[in-house]
Curated annotation (Swiss-Prot):
<dbReference type="GO" id="GO:0003723">
    <property type="term" value="F:RNA binding"/>
</dbReference>
<dbReference type="InterPro" id="IPR018496">
    <property type="entry name" value="PsdUridine_synth_RsuA/RluB_CS"/>
</dbReference>
<dbReference type="InterPro" id="IPR042092">
    <property type="entry name" value="PsdUridine_s_RsuA/RluB/E/F_cat"/>
</dbReference>
<dbReference type="Pfam" id="PF00849">
    <property type="entry name" value="PseudoU_synth_2"/>
</dbReference>
<dbReference type="InterPro" id="IPR050343">
    <property type="entry name" value="RsuA_PseudoU_synthase"/>
</dbReference>
<feature type="domain" description="S4 RNA-binding">
    <location>
        <begin position="3"/>
        <end position="70"/>
    </location>
</feature>
<keyword id="KW-0694">RNA-binding</keyword>
<dbReference type="GO" id="GO:0120159">
    <property type="term" value="F:rRNA pseudouridine synthase activity"/>
</dbReference>
<dbReference type="Pfam" id="PF01479">
    <property type="entry name" value="S4"/>
</dbReference>
<feature type="active site" description="Nucleophile">
    <location>
        <position position="109"/>
    </location>
</feature>
<dbReference type="InterPro" id="IPR036986">
    <property type="entry name" value="S4_RNA-bd_sf"/>
</dbReference>
<protein>
    <recommendedName>
        <fullName>Uncharacterized RNA pseudouridine synthase slr0361</fullName>
        <ecNumber>5.4.99.-</ecNumber>
    </recommendedName>
</protein>
<dbReference type="InterPro" id="IPR000748">
    <property type="entry name" value="PsdUridine_synth_RsuA/RluB/E/F"/>
</dbReference>
<dbReference type="InterPro" id="IPR020103">
    <property type="entry name" value="PsdUridine_synth_cat_dom_sf"/>
</dbReference>
<dbReference type="InterPro" id="IPR002942">
    <property type="entry name" value="S4_RNA-bd"/>
</dbReference>
<dbReference type="InterPro" id="IPR020094">
    <property type="entry name" value="TruA/RsuA/RluB/E/F_N"/>
</dbReference>
<comment type="similarity">
    <text>Belongs to the pseudouridine synthase RsuA family.</text>
</comment>
Length: 249
């Protein structure tokens, strides 16, 4: 299957996608003997892809890797940052940070914590981030203030965001007092900063946001707790379940 060249180079562990774009612009990448342009696509099973004159073969692709990370606060959900801030790849050992093509699937904003999937499986990433597949994700949300029952029902039923109504959500009140409330929120879509923006629409402030689960993936499983900043490899059963939810074998 033909894919954008910068994506292939990232999946092959040659460079991050941003660096791969720079390599293409610098004329260092060729497809079938011709210098590639940004936006070009290639099929590694059919095309000859070269970097600095060295051919990249289809069987050079690293094995598929699937990791679950418990992202701490103040860590970016990206592969690299031009300002030198800490990213989720910095949480991994050196042998996983480079050369494997790992990237986060979706994002948690800088101030949010919790479950984040990292993989180099491009097809799985594409499906998990496609609006067609409504993979449920569950969050602990601490809010300043006390929303009314009517506000919570609005959130559950769906609210307008960027001119489009959000999908229904599940909200469970865990605890509350006169100053704040702790909710368990399950979403089946992933719009940019969705929980924080919906809270703002209701006049509420998010004090803390922590993602517990991504589909079948849980931070706490098999009697073990994945601590902040730690990661683990997914089990074969978890990989199968995750792929099944997006119709991928």
């Amino acid at each position: 299957m033909a894919e954008r060249i910068q994506k292939l180079l990232s999946q092959w562990g040659i460079a991050s996608r941003r660096h791969a774009e720079e390599m293409i612009l610098a004329g260092r990448v060729s497809v079938n003997g011709k210098v590639a342009n940004l936006g070009d696509k290639a099929d590694p099973q059919q095309d000859f892809l070269s970097v600095d004159g060295k051919q990249i073969k289809a069987d050079n692709r690293p094995r598929d890797i699937y990791l679950l990370v418990n992202k701490p606060r103040d860590v970016l959900s990206t592969c690299d940052d031009p300002r030198g801030r800490k990213t989720v790849l910095d949480l991994l050992p050196q042998d996983l940070q480079r050369g494997k093509g790992l990237h986060p699937v979706g994002r948690l904003d800088r101030n949010s914590t919790g479950a984040l999937l990292l993989t180099n499986d491009g097809e799985l990433t594409l499906r998990l981030t496609h609006p067609r597949y409504h993979l449920p994700k569950t969050y602990d949300v601490w809010l300043e203030g006390n929303p009314s029952d009517e506000d919570l029902e609005k959130w559950r039923s769906g609210m307008m965001l960027d001119g489009k109504k959000t999908l229904p959500a599940t909200l469970e009140v865990i605890s509350e007092n006169k100053d704040q409330i702790h909710l368990l929120v399950t979403l089946t879509e992933g719009r940019n900063r969705q929980i924080r923006r919906l809270a703002e629409e209701l006049g509420l402030t998010v004090l803390k946001l922590h993602r517990r689960t991504i589909g079948p993936l849980q931070l706490h499983t098999r009697g073990k707790v994945l601590g902040s900043g730690q990661f683990r490899f997914l089990s074969p059963a978890e990989i199968r379940l995750l792929k099944k939810q997006v119709n991928l074998r």
